[in-house]
Amino acid sequence: MNYLFKNGRYLNEEGTIVATDLLVQDGKIAKIAKNISAENAEVIDVNGKLIAPGLVDVHVHLREPGGEHKETIETGTLAAAKGGFTTICAMPNTRPVPDSKEHMEDLQKRIQEKAHVNVLPYGAITVRQAGSEMTDFETLKELGAFAFTDDGVGVQDASMMLAAMKRAAKLNMAVVAHCEENTLINKGCVHEGKFSEKHGLNGIPSVCESVHIARDILLAEAADCHYHVCHVSTKGSVRVIRDAKRAGIKVTAEVTPHHLVLCEDDIPSVDPNFKMNPPLRGREDQEALIEGLLDGTIDIIATDHAPHTAEEKAQGIERAPFGITGFETAFPLLYTNLVKKGIITLEQLIQFLTEKPADTFGLETGRLKEGRAADITILDLEQEEKIDPTTFLSKGKNTPFAGWKCQGWPVMTLVGGKIVWQKESALV
């Protein structure tokens, strides 16, 4: 099916939002201009809505294989489509781990059969993510590994991490890291700060993250490797990454919507839906993350979509698993709490969720360009509604944002020119 989107707006190559029509033919963007006419195309009047590149999320947990009670490739990618994401990068903490030819081939087969959006799988750095035996990077790359990570745990052995970085550098691939020094975790379930002290809980100190990042940055410099830091959460981490960039080290970083929007002061009670890793930090950490995003220290926004069952989250804050679901709330949360409040511009938000993650990892997506695959999201910036987990397409309903009133919602998502999700009556 060919589509002609009329009376829209889009972010042009100069970084300005302007009026446009957009023609999709044979799965690709055929033309971007005003007053397009075309035969054999279904005309869709978007009535001033924003025609955006499909959003790109480089940090997601789809749980399949092994955790299908939490999420599946099918439900997770439907949730991604509803959230406006057309390309997502799946972390390897599944069972089995994509750490071998057999396991990666099985994962790719599942993706091909079940995914509603583009899914790029990470390859594990170590076998079973156990930290002791390196995987075959060359084979995993040949089978489509997006990059290498043991996300969910930090690689504790410095010699292992250095060897992994050297091997990845030879393959022109990135090493992506969840940064925690295990000896400093302290069996924590929240940030070591006011909230942990008030409720008598073990806390995870900020230095647990920043010291691991500092180590890895020096290793990356020695290996001349592209090193990407997952879900940065502390002021100290931002400072370390900023200094590394100034020194010319090839480091990039991401931050989550929840760390930009919340801090420990916003946790209302010992609610496990506010339990994530890294935890919500102090107010000054939150402010440093926003500053780092604005000055280029932090490159992109990624959701760290981490679905769990209601039963798992009901175990209490100390026993419940870390993580919150993120696909279906990311854009409206960020638009409402950052753009509408004047903290960042709409143009910046679109870039942090599209072209910047694509550029960081060399992906040919993230921009609306003639001739490229028609991965597109239509956004209604005027629409306002409350976040309701019962409407999530994800199996995971675990969110701290239930009941939040947000503005700016995806209403249609196309992948390769095919409509994979549409809000009922959104464009009527």
Swiss-Prot record:
It catalyses: (S)-dihydroorotate + H2O = N-carbamoyl-L-aspartate + H(+). Keywords: Hydrolase, Metal-binding, Pyrimidine biosynthesis, Zinc. It is an enzyme of class 3 (hydrolase). Its EC number is 3.5.2.3. Zn(2+) 1 binds at H59, H61, D151, D304. Pfam families: Amidohydro_1 (PF01979). GO terms for biological process: 'de novo' UMP biosynthetic process; purine nucleobase catabolic process. Pathway: Pyrimidine metabolism; UMP biosynthesis via de novo pathway; (S)-dihydroorotate from bicarbonate: step 3/3. Substrate binds at H61, L62, R63, N93, N277, H308, F322, G323. GO terms for molecular function: allantoinase activity; dihydroorotase activity; zinc ion binding. Binds 2 Zn(2+) ions per subunit. The active site is at D304. One of its GO terms (cellular component) is cytoplasm. Its cofactor is Zn(2+). The keyword Metal-binding applies. Zn(2+) 2 binds at D151, H178, H231. Catalyzes the reversible cyclization of carbamoyl aspartate to dihydroorotate. Belongs to the metallo-dependent hydrolases superfamily. DHOase family. Class I DHOase subfamily. This is Dihydroorotase. It comes from Bacillus cytotoxicus (strain DSM 22905 / CIP 110041 / 391-98 / NVH 391-98).
